[in-house]
Amino acid sequence: MEYTGYLFAHFIGEAQLGEQVYFASSRDGLHWKDLNAGNPVLISDIGEKGVRDPFIIRDVLNGKYIIIATDLCIASGKGWWSAQYNGSTNIIVWESKDLVKMKLNNAFMHHILKIFMNFLMHFISGG
């Protein structure tokens, strides 16, 4: 597979739609262009209905792309105090073969180590 650029998954702030998944692309890693006309690419309606700190990995076993993020949503009125002391207990996981059609998996109580074991299987040892 030949790579022709970079894809950046991110959120843009604490506004109502700011805590969702946005994509930007770059050919050189320095100059970025918002995709989807600057609108969210993925919007969560489960858990706290927010998406923060998304990142993309590729499953080396099946070639699928996986986007993982927390469901923390400051815009919902929860506030930073609650976020710091109560945290967020959910991880949102999307899967895709092409990063165009995305499938949302159950967000509640994903065990993040299982996801990384598929991705970094040869680096993880022990139980």
Predicted regions and their residues:
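Carbohydrate-active catalytic/glycan-binding domains of CAZyme proteins
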Residues: M1-G127
